[in-house]
Amino acid sequence: ERGELALKDARSKLADVEDALQKAKQDMARLLREYQELMNTKLALDVEIATYRKLLEGEECRLSGEGVGPVNISVVTNTVSSGYGGGSGFGGGLGGGLGGGLGGGLGGGLGGGLGSGLGGGGSSSFYSSSSGGVGLGGGLSVGGSGFSASSGRSLGFGSGGGSSSSVKFVSTTSSSRKSFKS
């Protein structure tokens, strides 16, 4: 009887520990998603700040008679990894470029991204995924004033049933502005 009671008690404790582990995994996945949302927001704000900073520098140059030079913005690498059983990772970003001035204007931009995830599990389980996207935008204006803007977005997602997964996101966006005197 003692052995049966000890066995029953051990099974009960094991079930409690498994429940706690499952809850911890869910909490970790939720926290990872929230963290990634915050990082995506921060990344978008950083790109926007850099864009406006470059635009202001170009306006200062134009007002002082130096003309507007090329504007190159944001090469961003964002890697997120998680290392628990049934792990998942998520990566995304936004890149944008903006250029403007007086006179004829020519502008174009390219944004692209590639995400891939790789995770290894137990004795013979293995999981791999990759995803990529590319966005292209450009504008041309000639006349009294010129303005061009471009942005690219890409999103990669991977998850693995093994012990870890990772997503790496790379976004490159550039925009240029050239003035022509008539």
Swiss-Prot record:
Domain (IF rod): residue spans on this chain: 1-63
Q: Where is the composition biased (Low complexity)?
A: 164-182
Q: Name one Pfam family in it.
A: Filament
Instruction: For the region Tail, give the residue spans.
Output: 63-182
Q: Which PROSITE patterns would you find in this protein's record?
A: IF_ROD_1, IF_ROD_2
Listed under GO cellular component are: intermediate filament
Site note Stutter applies to E1
Keyword terms, alphabetized: Coiled coil, Intermediate filament, Keratin
Name the species this protein comes from. Bos taurus (Bovine)
How it assembles, according to the record, is: Heterotetramer of two type I and two type II keratins.
Q: Where is this region: Coil 2?
A: 1-63
What family, per the record? Belongs to the intermediate filament family.
Sequence segments annotated as region (Disordered): 157-182
Q: Misc remark for this entry? A: There are two types of cytoskeletal and microfibrillar keratin: I (acidic; 40-55 kDa) and II (neutral to basic; 56-70 kDa).
Recorded protein name is Keratin, type II cytoskeletal 60 kDa, component III
